[in-house]
């Protein structure tokens, strides 16, 4: 990643939750501060590293975006651990290549879930701590199923706790989590938003 002119600082997620320091859960947080008072926004890429569009979109913000007011936080590898492996039995590549005007660039292709080296074994049934919802055991390593996280929870829950701490401490006004879907997936081209934010989410379609 080549930070663009809009990037004013780079911190690690462990800045907000020190227990992540030195682990595969720690990850870069790029800060783009306009210097003008305004709202703050967090963009997450790489929640599922086998969905490269979300990651690449976050990288483009880091390299090209220059906010006119307020502050933008971008985490391109939200689940950094999942970038260190691929999904078994899926014949997934470890990297992919993009031709650019400055030559070929390559990017890591990862897994949908935290590397089992960092968190194992999976339970038969995963009970989401905050809601009590029961899910498939493999979902225990899915970053999107671990919010708001816990300090005494799984490795994945500790990552989401760090992200939640960032949101709380920096008083983030809005968070966008970037994903990708295959063409045959039933929710392709979908935006999932809280009922209080549906109007704002609809604006992203235009």
Protein language model regions, located:
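Short glycine- and acidic-rich boundary segments immediately preceding or forming the N-terminal edge
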Residues: 1-29
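Short beta-strand-to-loop junctions in surface cap/lid or active-site-entrance loops
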Residues: 27-37
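Glycine-rich His-Gly loop
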Residues: 34, 45-49, 180
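Short beta-strand element of the alpha/beta-hydrolase
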Residues: 39-48, 176
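Di-metal (Zn2+ and/or Mg2+/Mn2+) metal-binding site signature of metallo-dependent hydrolases
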Residues: 48-56
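Active-site/substrate-binding loop(s) of hydrolase catalytic cores
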Residues: 52-53, 68-206
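A short, Lys/Arg-enriched amphipathic alpha-helix followed by its capping loop at the start of a domain
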Residues: 57-70
């Amino acid at each position: 990643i080549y930070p663009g002119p809009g990037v004013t600082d780079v911190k690690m997620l462990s800045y907000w939750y020190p227990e992540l320091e030195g682990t595969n859960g720690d990850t870069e947080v790029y800060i783009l501060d306009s210097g003008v008072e305004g709202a703050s926004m967090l963009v997450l890429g790489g929640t599922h590293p086998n969905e490269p569009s979300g990651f690449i979109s976050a990288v483009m913000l880091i390299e090209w975006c220059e906010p006119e007011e307020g502050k933008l936080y971008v985490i391109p590898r939200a689940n950094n651990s999942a970038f260190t492996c691929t999904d078994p039995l899926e014949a997934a590549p470890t990297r992919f290549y993009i031709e650019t005007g400055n030559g070929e660039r390559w990017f890591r292709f990862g897994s949908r879930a935290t590397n089992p080296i960092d968190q194992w074994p999976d339970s038969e049934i995963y009970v989401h701590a905050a809601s009590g919802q029961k899910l498939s055991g493999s979902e225990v390593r899915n970053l999107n199923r671990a919010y708001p996280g816990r300090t005494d929870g799984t490795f994945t829950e500790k990552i989401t706790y760090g992200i939640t701490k960032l949101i709380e401490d920096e008083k983030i006004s809005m968070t966008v989590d970037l994903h990708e879907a295959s063409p045959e997936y039933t929710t392709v081209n979908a935006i999932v938003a809280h009922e209080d934010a549906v109007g704002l989410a609809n604006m992203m379609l235009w």
